[in-house]
Amino acid sequence: MEKVDVYDELVNLKATELRLGLPGTEETVSCGKSNKRVLPEATEKEIESTGKTETASPPKAQIVGWPPVRSYRKNNVQTKKSESEGQGNYVKVSMDGAPYLRKIDLTMYKQYPELMKSLENMFKFSVGEYFEREGYKGSDFVPTYEDKDGDWMLVGDVPWEMFVSSCKRLRIMKGSEVKGLGCGGL
């Protein structure tokens, strides 16, 4: 046995051994059948001497995507928007044939007639009169809007509050292009 110890000292296998781990850390003895990791400080002898068979579990790693920050921020922003009355509901307004766009705040108006007067003054045109069955009569232009679903609808078809909450943009179209939007008289 002494020859083996002398050989180990001369060759110094431990110093030249290649292994994974940080330099200066001692190798831990682990059971070949267990899939659990052993803490580097605790060896089998220490575990047996203390009488404890379970080791303290490492702190739980945060699951990717948890907590759902994106949905939290989205909900938080929506509640802030509903709480603040000072913010306006700005939408773009375009008119067929006009080379420019405008942006208006829908919360400034109380009903459709106020909005129509403002649009007439802004773009210098006449809308005419709105009838529920026939749509807009007496004008070459018809105001339409895009709702939050992406559908184009006639301005005045829904109650004012619903219009203000669902309108994404306004477009004043030529009457010849509006035939499929729901008014039979055009």
Swiss-Prot record:
One of its GO terms (cellular component) is nucleus. SUPFAM superfamilies: CAD & PB1 domains (SSF54277). A motif (EAR-like (transcriptional repression)) lies at residues 18-22. Preferentially expressed in stems, leaves and flowers. GO terms for molecular function: DNA binding; DNA-binding transcription factor activity; identical protein binding; transcription cis-regulatory region binding. Pfam families: AUX_IAA. It comes from the Eukaryota. GO terms for biological process: auxin-activated signaling pathway; response to auxin. Residues 88-175 form the PB1 domain. It is found in: Nucleus. Keywords: Auxin signaling pathway, Nucleus, Repressor, Transcription, Transcription regulation. Residues 38-51 have a biased composition (Basic and acidic residues). Induction: By auxin. InterPro entries: AUX/IAA_dom, AUX_IAA, PB1-like. Residues 25-62 are annotated as: Disordered. Aux/IAA proteins are short-lived transcriptional factors that function as repressors of early auxin response genes at low auxin concentrations. Repression is thought to result from the interaction with auxin response factors (ARFs), proteins that bind to the auxin-responsive promoter element (AuxRE). Formation of heterodimers with ARF proteins may alter their ability to modulate early auxin response genes expression. Belongs to the Aux/IAA family. Homodimers and heterodimers. Interacts with TPL. The N-terminal half of the protein contains two conserved domains I and II. Domain I includes a slightly degenerated ERF-associated amphiphilic repression (EAR) motif which seems to be involved in the activity of transcriptional repression. Domain II is required for the correct degradation of the protein through the SCF-mediated ubiquitin-proteasome pathway. Interactions between Aux/IAA proteins and auxin response factors (ARFs) occur through their C-terminal dimerization domains III and IV. This is Auxin-responsive protein IAA4. It comes from Arabidopsis thaliana.
